[in-house]
Regions:
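Ser/Thr-centric signal marking residues that sit
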Residues: 27, 96, 109
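Hydrophobic ligand-binding cavity/cleft-lining segments
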Residues: 1-41, 168, 172-181
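K/E-rich alpha-helical interaction surfaces of small helical-bundle regulatory domains
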Residues: 19-34, 73-80, 126-140
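General beta-strand recognition
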Residues: 10, 21, 58, 82-84, ...
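Pocket-edge structural micro-motifs
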Residues: 13, 61, 87, 164, ...
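Hydrophobic-ligand binding "helix-grip"
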Residues: 33, 47-106, 116
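Short beta-edge strand/loop motif at the mouth of beta-sheet-based domains
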Residues: 10-11, 30-67, 150-160
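Terminal "cap-and-tail" regions of soluble proteins that handle hydrophobic small molecules
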Residues: 2-4, 66, 104-181
Length: 181
């Protein structure tokens, strides 16, 4: 994996929930739909996930009349701590590798994100703008899983609510402010 700074996007993000719930948002088709493509107004459809080394994933990303087909192969699957997979926009020369490391941190999870293999500087810039938005949407989806905002069907057990109460209150306030705008 070529992770030199000119060809790599590195991000860290704190989620208000344990690694197993962050893992679920990242890997379950019913939850991927909540965040994937959101930074550019897209909505994910036809999500397929074969979550094992050598398994594949794919989806159709739609924004009005624009459709993108995105797919890849899982290289490392160490639930709920490490996920490495390829990321390809069909019909383009865009092939990259993403690694997501989920580390327990206090009552939450610290994500260490690395994406490499950008075909040009512009692609890296676009992803550097898009991923932070997607991670915020993922964080909001995680809070919704805890009962803030809309509820998801077939959720993991809510055994991890202890310790996130202060984060939930902050999220409630933020969601109320955003709804008022």
């Amino acid at each position: 994996m070529d992770d030199n700074s000119a060809n790599a996007l590195r991000l860290t993000y704190h989620f208000a929930g344990p690694p197993d719930l962050v893992w679920a948002i990242w890997t379950r088709p019913d939850l991927i739909r909540s965040w994937f493509g959101s930074s550019h107004g897209f909505r994910a459809h036809d999500i397929a996930v074969d979550l094992r080394p050598g398994g594949t994933w794919s989806l159709r990303n739609v924004n009005g009349d624009v459709t993108e087909h995105v797919s890849g192969t899982y290289h490392e699957v160490e639930a709920p701590h490490r996920l490495v997979y390829s990321y390809h926009f069909e019909g383009t020369d865009f092939f990259s590798i993403i690694s997501a490391d989920l580390v327990p941190e206090g009552d939450g999870t610290r994500l260490h994100f690395l994406q490499t293999g950008f075909p040009d500087a512009q692609a890296r810039v676009e992803h550097a703008q898009g991923w932070p938005h997607a991670l915020r949407v993922m964080g909001d989806a995680l809070l919704a899983m805890h009962g803030v905002g809309m509820l998801w069907p077939a959720l993991p057990e809510k055994t991890h609510l202890d310790g996130v109460a202060r984060d939930l209150e902050a999220a409630r306030e933020r969601l109320a402010r955003e709804a008022a705008q």
